[in-house]
């Protein structure tokens, strides 16, 4: 029963927080601290991310199909994904990221990058994906995405921040974040599956399937309703939430 509860909590947390600007890693680590899940199984972690990957790919299947026909847009998505892929592989290979994954680090980054998100959201909108997602903008957003390798920053959050600084509207900023999540989550999933094979770890078990399924459902719903939310409201709610979460994380550390 405890394992089922862990699977449900991790899946929901991953699904909900992966695509909104609040840092999924901070939430998963806080969850682990609260419930004593000190060592989340690799298969659960990989399955949760894989479920999110399938959800975002399915949700944007039409856009992805259009991208494959539009070589220029497809090329720009690739360009924006190269920095995090190259640097991320190096940092993961030499376990540099794991050394940064502390509640203290995530507390501070959650607050600092939450404030950056607030500042960026004040920029006036002048650009959209159709006309302004240039090679230059793709490179800049790709460089912003590298910062997501620092635990607590939030991949979705930092891409939206970068896009808003470049004066993309909120909806398109979120869409850029979602589309760039596909190669990022795909790369992470492949690396995770490779690790599972290398460790000869048991996979494709009931727990893995349940994790991926729940993560898919909650990821899909989050993407759908986050876009609905952005049509009416700004990002202040998420900024406030990040500040509160960061304070809670630091409170846990320094208490």
Outline where the language-model segments fall.
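Multi-pass membrane proteins that catalyze or facilitate reactions on polyprenyl-/lipid-phosphate substrates
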Residues: 1-255
